[in-house]
Amino acid sequence: MPRTQGLALTILRRASTAGLLCAALLATETAWALDYRSVSEVAPAFDAPSAKAKPMFVVQPGTPVELVVSLEGWSKVRDSKGDLVWMEKKHLADKRTVIVRVDRAQVRATGDGKAALVFEAERDVVLELLEAAPAGWVKVRHRDGQSGFLKTQQVWGM
């Protein structure tokens, strides 16, 4: 086989391997995507997956939590402060919410920092997550009905 054909074959093999490696890395990235839920009703958080375990605190409805692991009837979740606790699965909903993590989040009419200000939400206010928006923005709705866009770094739960 001429040297140029051998070189071309080597390049093709390496490109193919690199492509497979990139696909595997992307699949791994997707597999590690965070899974968020919201608390559906006032619910106790426990230190172990049992109703007989020590109750740590009570979680309010709408609070976003990150699902870490699930066992039969129980889920280990992380809250916006980083606390890891166990909750009964029946208290978790698929509805997505976010919680404001800055002193005052500015909710705007569009996903643009120069857009009209719709309202401001203070730290720890829970907002319903409506949809992803332009890069770095998210559309949310306040429980009073007002909706708009805010920067993703101003909230936790995404």
Residue ranges of predicted features:
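N-terminal secretory signal peptides that target proteins for export/translocation
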Residues: 1-12
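SH3-family beta-barrel domains
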Residues: 29-48, 55-61, 68-126, 130-146, ...
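A general, composition-driven signal for non-globular sequence regions
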Residues: 7-8, 26, 31
